[in-house]
């Protein structure tokens, strides 16, 4: 998700999910009392349940839903806050589902980029009470280019492979040929994006 602006803003990127939190790469603290996250723009309907702080360049958030495992791996800045919220604040008639969300909050930012991988992996068998492939396969995620025309990331997998993803920010024509040079390596492709080995 890329946002451009002519002034400084706070950006929140929410991931709404169903299920149970299994693991995070960051420490978080639970809020002692459930209070709304804000006063308007929908924030008045979100309870703030917990807050964590980004630290090492990536944040991972894993959960299980319907006996399947999922992980979000996000490239984050050390100043980003990681919020755990739940829908349902200021809802006296219980019209809202009490669904949880994971929010990456970036304060005092101009143009900004949120790079994330949402990964389904593995399953849980209730009959044998065993989990298969319950851990993420993504080791890291790095933004290596974020410009006006192109954005590019790399990510390393537990298999040892490194993947490369580049996107043309201003031209989604499937026939346009793009050329991008990064670290003395030239990438060329047609269409809005390139997904390749690195």
Q: What is the meaning of each model-derived region?
A:
Residues 15-17, 71-76, 80, 84-87, ...:
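Short, hydrophobic/aromatic-enriched beta-strand segments in well-ordered soluble domains
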Residues 2-5, 106-108:
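Non-cytosolic beta-sheet module surface loops
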Residues 33-98:
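Trp/Gly-enriched beta-strand surface patches
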Residues 3-33:
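Acidic (Asp/Glu-rich), glycine- and aromatic
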Residues 101-113, 118-198:
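Non-catalytic terminal regions with compositionally biased, polar/charged low complexity
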Residues 20-26, 81-84, 94, 169-182:
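Short, surface-exposed linear segments at secondary-structure transitions and domain or protein termini
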Residues 11-16, 39-42, 47, 57, ...:
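Extended repeat-based interaction scaffolds and adjacent low-complexity, acidic/S/T/P-biased segments
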Residues 19-27, 34, 82, 135-138, ...:
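Short glycine-aromatic motifs
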